[in-house]
């Protein structure tokens, strides 16, 4: 699952060097200035060791999102009319955003070809790092056509947490001239999270293991966003702090056994485009493994289903944390 993403994350995080480009916004003359003082919104990204500086003075009008997560981020900010297309839908769209999503042109089930991408005259692109690699459309080809590229920091850093995600939403809002709307959304998410945490403050913390898939040994979360958001609801990833400085990677069942999690959180791809086992099949696979029978989570049948989009950066995190908190701690949160 995340194996495809890890290589490009490394590329994006390589030390900045070589040429620096500045790309101006390509919005139409009728697009309002982003800031009252007319100053550009700026940011930088690094691709294959080359730093690129981007700047937009007017909000983009032909944006393309190359991942479901960034698509939902844009839709949450009401930017569907600024989107020329979307791609790589991995599961069902977040229900509150379905109507907005239906207004956006779908360019491809996965990544579009360069020709299809350019056919909608994009002036802005966003998505997971892989979207701008040789696996999809290399960043340099977009940059050559003066397409601004923005990568959420929460999708890059092994230190990313919910605050990183919130900052990404605010930056996206700033780029599109809707910063106040982004800030309002963030404030609402903070309020909801505070209510969740108030219900949990006197409860003991639980130990969890995140099971994505396996090939003899489990593919799991170690550090980064998934681990850090679970901490917010009193759930500690048993694979964190073991010296593996990666977000997702292959682990070992021996380590899981030694760590003895109370719950196993299972990524369910049953309705996605990924070729993985669904939730029930994964449970049966775990239960049929003789060496796992003494793990507390297995003995007590503590398996929790999640969708990938619920435990990775995007707009669903706080809603997912509410449900996960209820299941992990056995409480009802209004």
Predicted regions and their residues:
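Bacterial N-terminal signal peptides
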Residues: 14-22
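A short, structured surface patch at a secondary-structure boundary
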Residues: 62-120, 124-130, 238
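Alpha-helical, coiled-coil/dimerization segments enriched in small aliphatic residues
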Residues: 89-96, 219-248
């Amino acid at each position: 699952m995340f194996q495809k993403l890890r290589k490009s994350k490394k590329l994006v995080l390589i030390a900045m060097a070589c040429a620096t480009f500045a790309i101006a916004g390509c919005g139409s003359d009728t697009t309002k200035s982003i800031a009252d003082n007319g100053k550009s919104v700026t940011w930088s990204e690094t691709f294959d060791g080359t730093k690129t500086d981007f700047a937009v003075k007017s909000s983009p009008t032909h944006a393309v999102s190359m991942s479901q997560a960034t698509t939902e981020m844009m839709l949450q900010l009401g930017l569907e009319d600024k989107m020329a297309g979307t791609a790589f839908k991995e599961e069902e769209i977040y229900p509150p955003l379905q109507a907005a999503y239906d207004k956006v042109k779908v360019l491809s089930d996965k990544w579009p070809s360069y020709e299809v991408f350019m056919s909608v005259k994009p002036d802005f692109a966003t998505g997971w790092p892989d979207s701008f690699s040789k696996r999809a459309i290399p960043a340099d080809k977009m940059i050559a056509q003066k397409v601004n590229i923005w990568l959420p920091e929460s999708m890059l850093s092994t230190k990313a947490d919910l605050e990183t995600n919130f900052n990404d939403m605010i930056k996206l809002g700033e780029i599109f001239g809707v910063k106040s709307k982004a800030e309002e959304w963030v404030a609402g998410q903070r309020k909801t999270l505070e209510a969740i945490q108030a219900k949990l403050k006197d409860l003991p913390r639980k130990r969890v293991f995140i099971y994505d898939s396996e090939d003899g040994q489990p593919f799991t979360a170690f550090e980064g966003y998934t681990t850090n958001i679970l901490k917010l609801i009193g759930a500690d990833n048993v694979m964190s702090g073991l010296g593996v400085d990666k977000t997702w990677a292959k682990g070992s069942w021996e380590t899981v056994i030694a760590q003895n999690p109370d719950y196993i959180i299972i990524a369910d791809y049953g309705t996605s485009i990924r070729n993985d086992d669904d939730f029930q099949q994964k449970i049966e696979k775990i239960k049929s493994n003789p060496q796992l029978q003494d793990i507390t989570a297995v003995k007590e049948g503590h398996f929790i289903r999640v969708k990938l989009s619920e435990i990775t950066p995007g707009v669903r995190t706080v809603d997912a944390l509410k449900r996960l908190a209820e299941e992990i701690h056995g409480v009802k949160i209004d």
